[in-house]
């Protein structure tokens, strides 16, 4: 499964369960060169998911099966967890756990 397919699946699951979804879409500026219009430190997670009435906020980095996390992505996840935030690195094989997490309230 491509990362983009996995991402669409997670976004659809989140929306079906009442989550608001933030995803920064990159734009191709020339062949092989992509940028994101939003500024910030590199490696920020792919998705931010929120459900206000449940008090839920999740940061999720998505990878295709076998995909590698960059040092900057690891740093963001560690930093977010260090603040008490809920942050994950999710792979397609994590789908059962993702469904469970998106279906329940804040742990």
What are these regions (language model features)?
Residues 1-107:
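Catalytic phosphate/metal-binding cores of nucleic-acid and nucleotide-processing enzymes, i.e., regions
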